[in-house]
């Protein structure tokens, strides 16, 4: 079995590549810039960029971790082209980092991209495993503005965020035993569903800052982000994260992390304590 990992210079892909290397598992690192690839034992490096011909880099690969590409209007087309390349190269199994509630009607707009990618994988003829990640707990401190506020139209909704470390551990488990996990869709969450008031309080305790959650209407959310200089689609996607929380799409706790890895999922306090 030959395993390949995309995004090996990133957070999830990097953790997966390192864990496999430490176990002595040969891994092919698929990266945009080979010069930035981590130097790990038992690894080889091949250039691969979503949106370009990746079939040569995938030749001989049997099992593949496909870390979703960067957010962009072209992401769905790039994912579909990459899946076509993987099938053409003879890849047998793809483990894909998706998102909770992925599908055409998801409140979180970028989860619709993931739904489209899942559909392409199911139709590809390759075996697949979907890792539907919740919000990364590691990223929640970035939601705090300079004024100490988390702002958005999330109402009283909750999120069951997951640690990046846990996503990587699940991915490693699936890659090492792909047949056991074939055709499975896993919901990867932490052990608790938190409202944004609770998230703000946890970040405040961990950082010593005064952090609060400010409920916004959709219109207020658009106005408060007007100075970001971001494209309209990106602002809409950011705001829809909060809308998905308000609608309850991100608030369901799953035990899949512990069931798959045998270890309890990390909670927000643990993640913040190691940040």
Functional labels for PLM-detected ranges:
Residues 219-275:
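A hydrophobic C-terminal alpha-helical subdomain
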Residues 53, 59, 154, 192, ...:
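Compositionally biased, intrinsically disordered low-complexity regions
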Residues 2-40, 59-62, 68-80, 84-93, ...:
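Oxidoreductase cofactor-interface core, primarily capturing Rossmann-like NAD(P)-dependent enzymes
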Residues 53, 57, 78, 268-271:
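Hydrophobic alpha-helical packing elements
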Residues 43-62:
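Conserved Rossmann-fold cofactor-binding substructure of NAD(P)-dependent oxidoreductases
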